[in-house]
């Protein structure tokens, strides 16, 4: 069961309509998350598994569970590669 949590530290969060801006002070980079990635990011609390987040995503966005799980795993991988998530 894969669980990740948002990195603690210098990441400022700002809303931009349905998107979310993550301002990473360590890398001096700004990352813009669309509504799907935002939904996933906000649930990365170290308690919910990728599968649980995918179930919530499928319900919220009315998509098939397998599609939601693929999106969650892909998004988690990208966020982890950007050092915005750490192991839960």
Which ranges hold each PLM region?
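Long, low-complexity, charged/polar intrinsically disordered regions in eukaryotic proteins
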Residues: 1-25
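Long, charge-rich, low-complexity alpha-helical segments
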Residues: 16, 26-88
């Amino acid at each position: 069961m894969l669980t990740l949590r948002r990195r603690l530290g210098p990441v400022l969060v700002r809303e931009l309509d349905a998107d979310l801006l993550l301002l990473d002070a360590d890398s001096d980079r700004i990352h813009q998350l669309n509504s799907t990635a935002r939904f996933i990011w906000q649930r990365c609390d170290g308690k919910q598994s990728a599968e649980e987040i995918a179930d919530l995503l499928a319900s919220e966005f009315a998509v098939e569970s397998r599609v939601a799980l693929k999106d969650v795993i892909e998004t988690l991988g990208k966020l982890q590669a950007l050092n915005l998530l750490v192991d839960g």
